[in-house]
Protein backbone atom coordinates (compact mmCIF):
# COMPACT_ATOMS: atom_id res chain seq x y z
CA UNK A 1 0.00 0.00 0.00
CA UNK A 2 2.79 2.41 0.93
CA UNK A 3 4.50 1.61 -2.35
CA UNK A 4 1.26 2.36 -4.26
CA UNK A 5 0.79 5.69 -2.46
CA UNK A 6 4.38 6.63 -3.15
CA UNK A 7 3.84 5.95 -6.86
CA UNK A 8 0.67 8.07 -6.87
CA UNK A 9 2.48 10.96 -5.15
CA UNK A 10 5.35 10.68 -7.62
CA UNK A 11 2.92 10.69 -10.58
CA UNK A 12 1.12 13.77 -9.25
CA UNK A 13 4.41 15.55 -8.74
CA UNK A 14 5.44 14.71 -12.29
CA UNK A 15 2.19 16.14 -13.64
CA UNK A 16 2.61 19.24 -11.49
CA UNK A 17 6.04 20.03 -12.88
CA UNK A 18 5.24 19.11 -16.50
CA UNK A 19 5.07 22.40 -18.43
CA UNK A 20 1.85 23.15 -20.25
CA UNK A 21 2.51 24.94 -23.51
CA UNK A 22 -0.34 27.24 -24.48
CA UNK A 23 -1.18 27.46 -28.15
CA UNK A 24 -0.49 30.80 -29.81
CA UNK A 25 -3.72 32.45 -30.95
CA UNK A 26 -4.11 33.45 -34.60
CA UNK A 27 -7.02 35.84 -35.10
CA UNK A 28 -8.25 35.28 -38.63
CA UNK A 29 -10.70 37.58 -40.42
CA UNK A 30 -13.09 35.47 -42.53
CA UNK A 31 -16.11 36.29 -44.66
CA UNK A 32 -18.49 33.75 -43.12
CA UNK A 33 -21.30 31.95 -44.90
CA UNK A 34 -19.38 28.73 -45.48
CA UNK A 35 -17.57 29.85 -48.65
CA UNK A 36 -14.95 27.43 -50.04
CA UNK A 37 -12.14 29.90 -49.26
CA UNK A 38 -13.26 30.09 -45.64
CA UNK A 39 -13.47 26.29 -45.48
CA UNK A 40 -9.81 25.94 -46.42
CA UNK A 41 -9.01 27.35 -42.97
CA UNK A 42 -11.78 25.32 -41.32
CA UNK A 43 -10.29 22.15 -42.80
CA UNK A 44 -6.99 22.96 -41.11
CA UNK A 45 -8.84 23.24 -37.82
CA UNK A 46 -10.58 19.91 -38.29
CA UNK A 47 -7.44 18.11 -39.42
CA UNK A 48 -5.34 19.61 -36.61
CA UNK A 49 -2.81 21.31 -38.89
CA UNK A 50 -2.78 24.58 -36.94
CA UNK A 51 -2.40 22.85 -33.57
CA UNK A 52 0.51 20.87 -35.02
CA UNK A 53 2.16 24.25 -35.55
CA UNK A 54 1.37 25.42 -32.01
CA UNK A 55 -1.47 27.67 -33.18
CA UNK A 56 -5.03 28.05 -31.94
CA UNK A 57 -6.97 29.33 -34.95
CA UNK A 58 -9.66 31.87 -34.06
CA UNK A 59 -11.83 32.56 -37.14
CA UNK A 60 -13.67 35.87 -36.72
CA UNK A 61 -16.51 36.76 -39.09
CA UNK A 62 -16.52 40.42 -40.06
CA UNK A 63 -17.44 42.58 -43.03
CA UNK A 64 -14.71 42.95 -45.61
CA UNK A 65 -13.84 46.58 -44.91
CA UNK A 66 -14.13 46.40 -41.08
CA UNK A 67 -12.04 43.22 -41.08
CA UNK A 68 -9.26 44.78 -43.14
CA UNK A 69 -9.35 47.88 -40.94
CA UNK A 70 -8.96 45.62 -37.91
CA UNK A 71 -5.99 43.91 -39.59
CA UNK A 72 -4.33 47.28 -40.21
CA UNK A 73 -4.93 48.26 -36.57
CA UNK A 74 -3.46 44.99 -35.25
CA UNK A 75 -6.78 43.66 -33.92
CA UNK A 76 -6.54 40.76 -36.42
CA UNK A 77 -3.46 38.73 -37.31
CA UNK A 78 -4.54 37.58 -40.78
CA UNK A 79 -7.35 38.09 -43.26
CA UNK A 80 -8.85 35.81 -45.88
CA UNK A 81 -9.99 38.76 -48.01
CA UNK A 82 -7.45 39.25 -50.80
CA UNK A 83 -9.46 41.66 -52.95
CA UNK A 84 -10.20 44.20 -50.24
CA UNK A 85 -6.70 43.64 -48.86
CA UNK A 86 -5.12 44.47 -52.22
CA UNK A 87 -7.28 47.58 -52.52
CA UNK A 88 -6.11 48.75 -49.10
CA UNK A 89 -2.46 48.09 -50.00
CA UNK A 90 -2.77 50.07 -53.23
CA UNK A 91 -4.05 52.98 -51.15
CA UNK A 92 -1.03 52.76 -48.85
CA UNK A 93 -2.06 50.33 -46.09
CA UNK A 94 0.91 48.50 -44.48
CA UNK A 95 -0.18 45.01 -45.53
CA UNK A 96 1.08 42.19 -47.76
CA UNK A 97 -0.64 39.36 -49.58
CA UNK A 98 1.42 36.28 -48.69
CA UNK A 99 -0.67 33.45 -50.13
CA UNK A 100 -3.23 33.08 -52.92
CA UNK A 101 -6.12 30.63 -53.15
CA UNK A 102 -8.13 31.51 -56.27
CA UNK A 103 -6.93 32.84 -59.61
CA UNK A 104 -10.39 33.45 -61.05
CA UNK A 105 -13.49 34.57 -59.18
CA UNK A 106 -15.90 31.86 -58.02
CA UNK A 107 -18.81 34.27 -58.16
CA UNK A 108 -22.02 34.44 -60.14
CA UNK A 109 -24.31 37.36 -60.96
CA UNK A 110 -27.73 36.01 -60.04
CA UNK A 111 -31.18 37.50 -60.47
CA UNK A 112 -34.74 36.46 -59.75
CA UNK A 113 -37.79 36.17 -61.95
CA UNK A 114 -38.27 39.81 -62.97
CA UNK A 115 -34.86 39.92 -64.71
CA UNK A 116 -34.46 37.55 -67.63
CA UNK A 117 -31.20 38.74 -69.21
CA UNK A 118 -28.28 41.01 -68.39
CA UNK A 119 -29.67 43.90 -70.44
CA UNK A 120 -32.77 43.95 -68.22
CA UNK A 121 -30.65 45.48 -65.45
CA UNK A 122 -30.45 48.70 -67.41
CA UNK A 123 -32.55 51.44 -65.85
CA UNK A 124 -31.12 51.81 -62.35
CA UNK A 125 -31.79 48.24 -61.22
CA UNK A 126 -30.04 47.50 -57.91
CA UNK A 127 -27.14 45.03 -57.90
CA UNK A 128 -25.82 43.79 -54.56
CA UNK A 129 -22.03 43.70 -54.32
CA UNK A 130 -19.65 43.72 -51.35
CA UNK A 131 -17.99 46.79 -49.83
CA UNK A 132 -17.27 49.52 -52.36
CA UNK A 133 -13.68 49.08 -53.50
CA UNK A 134 -13.64 45.40 -52.51
CA UNK A 135 -13.12 42.54 -54.97
CA UNK A 136 -16.74 42.01 -56.00
CA UNK A 137 -17.28 45.71 -56.52
CA UNK A 138 -14.09 46.04 -58.59
CA UNK A 139 -14.91 42.98 -60.70
CA UNK A 140 -18.49 44.09 -61.32
CA UNK A 141 -17.32 47.51 -62.51
CA UNK A 142 -14.88 45.76 -64.85
CA UNK A 143 -17.36 43.22 -66.24
CA UNK A 144 -20.56 45.23 -66.80
CA UNK A 145 -19.09 47.52 -69.52
CA UNK A 146 -18.13 44.42 -71.52
CA UNK A 147 -21.85 43.73 -71.77
CA UNK A 148 -22.93 47.25 -72.61
CA UNK A 149 -23.81 48.40 -69.10
CA UNK A 150 -22.32 51.49 -67.48
CA UNK A 151 -21.91 50.70 -63.75
CA UNK A 152 -22.23 54.40 -62.96
CA UNK A 153 -25.32 55.23 -64.99
CA UNK A 154 -27.23 52.10 -65.97
CA UNK A 155 -27.38 50.26 -62.63
CA UNK A 156 -27.15 51.06 -58.94
CA UNK A 157 -24.42 49.10 -57.20
CA UNK A 158 -25.45 48.53 -53.60
CA UNK A 159 -22.93 47.71 -50.90
CA UNK A 160 -23.91 44.61 -48.90
CA UNK A 161 -20.79 43.96 -46.90
CA UNK A 162 -21.45 40.49 -45.48
CA UNK A 163 -21.59 37.79 -48.15
CA UNK A 164 -24.22 35.91 -46.14
CA UNK A 165 -26.58 38.92 -46.43
CA UNK A 166 -26.64 39.13 -50.24
CA UNK A 167 -28.76 36.04 -50.88
CA UNK A 168 -31.51 37.13 -48.42
CA UNK A 169 -31.45 40.60 -50.01
CA UNK A 170 -32.00 39.01 -53.42
CA UNK A 171 -34.74 36.64 -52.27
CA UNK A 172 -36.66 39.38 -50.46
CA UNK A 173 -36.45 41.74 -53.42
CA UNK A 174 -34.23 44.30 -51.69
CA UNK A 175 -31.98 44.09 -54.75
CA UNK A 176 -32.74 43.01 -58.32
CA UNK A 177 -29.53 41.02 -58.71
CA UNK A 178 -26.62 40.04 -56.51
CA UNK A 179 -23.10 38.69 -56.81
CA UNK A 180 -23.12 35.36 -54.99
CA UNK A 181 -20.72 32.61 -53.98
CA UNK A 182 -21.00 29.08 -55.38
CA UNK A 183 -22.88 27.94 -52.28
CA UNK A 184 -25.41 30.76 -52.38
CA UNK A 185 -25.83 30.45 -56.16
CA UNK A 186 -27.03 26.88 -55.75
CA UNK A 187 -29.43 27.94 -52.98
CA UNK A 188 -30.73 30.81 -55.13
CA UNK A 189 -31.37 28.52 -58.11
CA UNK A 190 -33.36 26.22 -55.83
CA UNK A 191 -35.58 29.24 -55.08
CA UNK A 192 -36.24 29.92 -58.75
CA UNK A 193 -33.47 32.44 -59.41
CA UNK A 194 -31.13 32.13 -62.38
CA UNK A 195 -27.57 33.01 -63.35
CA UNK A 196 -26.84 35.96 -65.63
CA UNK A 197 -23.10 35.33 -65.86
CA UNK A 198 -20.17 33.55 -64.23
CA UNK A 199 -17.39 35.94 -63.21
CA UNK A 200 -14.73 33.28 -63.70
CA UNK A 201 -15.46 33.31 -67.45
CA UNK A 202 -14.96 37.06 -67.58
CA UNK A 203 -11.61 37.83 -65.96
CA UNK A 204 -8.72 36.78 -63.74
CA UNK A 205 -9.01 38.04 -60.20
CA UNK A 206 -7.73 37.21 -56.73
CA UNK A 207 -10.27 37.33 -53.95
CA UNK A 208 -9.08 34.80 -51.36
CA UNK A 209 -5.82 33.94 -49.67
CA UNK A 210 -3.83 35.26 -46.72
CA UNK A 211 -3.21 38.94 -45.99
CA UNK A 212 -0.98 40.02 -43.10
CA UNK A 213 0.15 43.26 -41.48
CA UNK A 214 3.71 44.24 -42.42
CA UNK A 215 4.68 44.57 -38.76
CA UNK A 216 3.51 41.02 -38.02
CA UNK A 217 5.35 39.74 -41.10
CA UNK A 218 8.57 41.44 -40.00
CA UNK A 219 8.53 40.99 -36.23
CA UNK A 220 6.76 37.61 -35.94
CA UNK A 221 8.10 35.80 -38.95
CA UNK A 222 8.20 32.39 -37.24
CA UNK A 223 4.52 32.79 -36.28
CA UNK A 224 3.61 33.73 -39.86
CA UNK A 225 5.64 30.81 -41.22
CA UNK A 226 3.89 28.31 -38.94
CA UNK A 227 0.49 29.76 -39.85
CA UNK A 228 1.26 29.53 -43.56
CA UNK A 229 2.62 25.99 -43.26
CA UNK A 230 -0.67 24.90 -41.70
CA UNK A 231 -2.68 26.85 -44.27
CA UNK A 232 -0.73 25.37 -47.17
CA UNK A 233 -1.45 21.87 -45.83
CA UNK A 234 -5.12 22.84 -45.49
CA UNK A 235 -5.18 24.18 -49.05
CA UNK A 236 -3.77 20.95 -50.48
CA UNK A 237 -6.14 18.86 -48.36
CA UNK A 238 -9.21 20.86 -49.46
CA UNK A 239 -8.31 20.58 -53.16
CA UNK A 240 -7.64 16.84 -53.13
CA UNK A 241 -10.00 15.48 -50.46
CA UNK A 242 -13.46 15.79 -52.01
CA UNK A 243 -15.15 13.64 -49.38
CA UNK A 244 -13.78 15.66 -46.46
CA UNK A 245 -14.26 19.02 -48.19
CA UNK A 246 -17.88 18.30 -49.07
CA UNK A 247 -18.56 17.20 -45.50
CA UNK A 248 -17.39 20.63 -44.32
CA UNK A 249 -19.55 22.32 -46.96
CA UNK A 250 -22.56 20.41 -45.68
CA UNK A 251 -21.76 21.44 -42.11
CA UNK A 252 -20.97 25.13 -42.64
CA UNK A 253 -22.79 25.87 -45.89
CA UNK A 254 -25.94 23.87 -45.06
CA UNK A 255 -25.79 22.08 -48.42
CA UNK A 256 -26.99 18.65 -49.47
CA UNK A 257 -24.36 16.05 -50.30
CA UNK A 258 -25.04 16.46 -54.03
CA UNK A 259 -24.88 20.27 -53.91
CA UNK A 260 -21.68 20.20 -51.85
CA UNK A 261 -20.04 17.92 -54.41
CA UNK A 262 -21.17 20.30 -57.18
CA UNK A 263 -19.66 23.31 -55.41
CA UNK A 264 -16.36 21.49 -54.89
CA UNK A 265 -16.16 20.65 -58.59
CA UNK A 266 -17.02 24.26 -59.48
CA UNK A 267 -14.24 25.86 -57.43
CA UNK A 268 -11.29 23.47 -57.75
CA UNK A 269 -10.37 24.51 -61.34
CA UNK A 270 -9.92 28.16 -60.32
CA UNK A 271 -7.50 27.51 -57.46
CA UNK A 272 -3.79 28.26 -57.72
CA UNK A 273 -1.37 25.37 -58.03
CA UNK A 274 0.80 26.10 -55.00
CA UNK A 275 -0.58 29.15 -53.19
CA UNK A 276 1.27 31.69 -55.36
CA UNK A 277 0.88 33.42 -58.72
CA UNK A 278 3.62 34.39 -61.23
CA UNK A 279 4.92 37.93 -61.50
CA UNK A 280 3.13 38.71 -64.77
CA UNK A 281 -0.18 37.79 -63.13
CA UNK A 282 0.70 40.06 -60.19
CA UNK A 283 1.35 42.90 -62.62
CA UNK A 284 -1.99 42.32 -64.39
CA UNK A 285 -3.83 42.40 -61.08
CA UNK A 286 -2.15 45.65 -60.06
CA UNK A 287 -2.97 47.25 -63.42
CA UNK A 288 -6.61 46.18 -63.20
CA UNK A 289 -7.10 47.29 -59.61
CA UNK A 290 -5.30 50.63 -59.89
CA UNK A 291 -7.47 51.44 -62.92
CA UNK A 292 -10.69 50.47 -61.11
CA UNK A 293 -9.71 52.37 -57.96
CA UNK A 294 -8.41 55.36 -59.94
CA UNK A 295 -4.97 55.19 -58.32
CA UNK A 296 -2.42 57.12 -60.34
CA UNK A 297 0.98 56.07 -59.04
CA UNK A 298 3.64 53.50 -59.87
CA UNK A 299 3.14 50.28 -57.92
CA UNK A 300 5.36 47.23 -58.34
CA UNK A 301 4.48 43.66 -57.25
CA UNK A 302 6.87 43.72 -54.28
CA UNK A 303 4.72 46.46 -52.74
CA UNK A 304 1.65 44.19 -52.75
CA UNK A 305 2.79 40.54 -52.70
CA UNK A 306 5.39 38.57 -50.75
CA UNK A 307 5.38 34.85 -51.49
CA UNK A 308 8.86 34.20 -50.08
CA UNK A 309 7.61 32.12 -47.14
CA UNK A 310 5.16 30.06 -49.20
CA UNK A 311 7.85 29.48 -51.84
CA UNK A 312 10.18 28.26 -49.09
CA UNK A 313 7.48 25.98 -47.65
CA UNK A 314 6.79 24.49 -51.09
CA UNK A 315 10.50 23.72 -51.50
CA UNK A 316 10.57 22.29 -47.98
CA UNK A 317 7.74 19.89 -48.76
CA UNK A 318 8.96 19.08 -52.27
CA UNK A 319 5.73 20.34 -53.85
What are these regions, as identified by a protein language model?
Residues 1-4:
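Positively charged n-region of N-terminal signal peptides that target proteins for export
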Residues 6-16:
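Bacterial N-terminal signal peptides
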Residues 16, 20-22:
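Boundary at the C-terminal end of the N-terminal hydrophobic targeting segment
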Residues 22-153, 157-160, 166-172, 176-182, ...:
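Short, glycine-/small- and polar/acidic-enriched structural segments
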Residues 84, 163-253:
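Pocket-lining segment of extracytoplasmic ligand-binding domains
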Residues 134-151, 231-262, 301-305, 314-317:
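Ligand-binding clefts/hinges and TM-proximal coupling segments of bilobed small-molecule sensing domains
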Residues 219-297:
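Secondary-structure end/capping motifs
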Residues 287-319:
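Conserved C-terminal helix/tail region of periplasmic/extracytoplasmic solute-binding proteins
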Amino acid sequence: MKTFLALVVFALQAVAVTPVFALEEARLHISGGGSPNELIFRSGQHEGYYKQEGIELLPIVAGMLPGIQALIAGAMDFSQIGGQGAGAILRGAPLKIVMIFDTRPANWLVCCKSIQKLEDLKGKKQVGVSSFGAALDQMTREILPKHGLDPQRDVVLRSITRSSDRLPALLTGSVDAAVLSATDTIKAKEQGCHVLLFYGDELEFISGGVVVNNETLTKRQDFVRRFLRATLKSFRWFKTNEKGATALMRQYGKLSAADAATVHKMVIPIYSRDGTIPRNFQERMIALQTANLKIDKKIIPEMVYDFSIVDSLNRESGK
